[in-house]
Amino acid sequence: MEHEDLERMEKGIYTEGFFNLTDDNIYKSKVIKDIDTNIGQLLKTDAKFYAIHVSPSEKELLAMGNSEQEQAQAMKRYIREVFIPEYAKNFNKELSASDIKFYGKIHFDRSRSKNKQNMHCHLIVSRKDQANKKKLSPLTNHKDTKNGVIKGGFDRVNLFQQAEQGFDKLFDYNRQQSESFNYHNTMKNSSIPKQIELQEQKIYGEKKKETFQSDEKYNKIFCNLASKQDNKYPYNLQNSNDSLLSIF
């Protein structure tokens, strides 16, 4: 990430600093210190933070603005107003966005991408809440648990759905069925008859609009959650390039 920033600054090109829920242009040293010290009661085997990658498609980026600066400001608005609030809600612990300690960094290039539009956002989200009291893991398999030692949980599918719907509402984006998380999740995990039914619905919708897009890549917002302990990626829900939202 630093390599891209240095190249852009040397060329006098617009560059974004770190941001959180309320502030912009935060120094890297503050980010490191804040995350490294927010580890109360964590075990040595626990991850200190999770890395989340939000990567809109070219079509989605065009809905966010015409210039890199416009798209970057729109991305920060999306993270602050949609993604982090939904992330907090999905723990089912009555948390709000202000309870989540995170830092974001926006970048504009991808080394292996041939797209003209490549803006994306890296989020670093602390394992502990803002008060350094509650452990929060988006990789837990518990979902809204009411009884037992573990209360709450995390519903990743619901997060993806809400993050997608929030994006569409915020940017007035007209998402086609074949672009949706539900479509790709069903195509990946459902029975053959259900997959055929969805394919038929997709084809019917395309014919109705007199548009054929089967040779184009599906639009996608990648949301990659990774435990940054030992640089391992322990959880893999779906890793298809055609999926709207993926966790690694």
Question: Model-predicted segments: where are they?
Answer:
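N-terminal nicking endonuclease/strand-transfer module with a His-rich metal-binding environment
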Residues: 1-248
